[in-house]
A protein has these predicted regions:
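Amphipathic alpha-helical dimerization/coiled-coil segments
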Residues: 2-6, 89-112
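Short beta-strand/turn micro-motifs at beta-sheet edges
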Residues: 8-12, 70-71
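N-terminal helix-turn-helix DNA-binding core of bacterial DNA-binding proteins
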Residues: 10-54
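Short, hydrophobic-biased segments on the C-terminal half of alpha helices
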Residues: 54-61
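Beta-hairpin "wing" of winged helix-turn-helix
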Residues: 63-75, 83
Length: 112
């Protein structure tokens, strides 16, 4: 009999924490979509896709967690920068607490 249980898929884990990861990158500095993507990949999230990041930025913006502004670019089209606003910083703080509690629980379950 073949088992239907598969190893943990990192892309599935990423879906659950992409909002937190994007907010954390923007907490360090304002950024446009590609900069946020580079920040995530530099932190070790190489699997994250462009469309996922751009979609997350739009969703967080429409949820009122980010502000945006446009900066002219000499290398092509203008760039839309995103920054955390007060609601975004509050969400980042709440999500960080939740993440630490969850990660601690998982660490106790699976061990170090």
């Amino acid at each position: 009999m073949r088992s239907s249980v598969r190893p943990v898929d990192p892309s599935q884990l990423l879906k659950g924490v992409l909002d937190l990861a994007v907010l954390a990158v923007l907490d360090r500095a304002d950024g446009y979509g590609y900069e946020v993507l580079r920040g995530l990949r530099a932190a070790g999230l190489e699997e994250v896709g462009d469309a996922s990041v751009y979609g997350t930025l739009r969703r967080l913006y429409h949820a009122g967690l980010l502000t945006s502004y446009v900066v002219p670019s000499e290398e092509g089209p203008h760039r839309k920068y995103y920054s955390l606003n007060a609601r975004g910083r509050d969400r980042l703080a709440e999500s960080t607490k939740t993440w630490h509690a969850f990660a601690g629980t998982m660490e106790r379950l699976v061990g170090a």
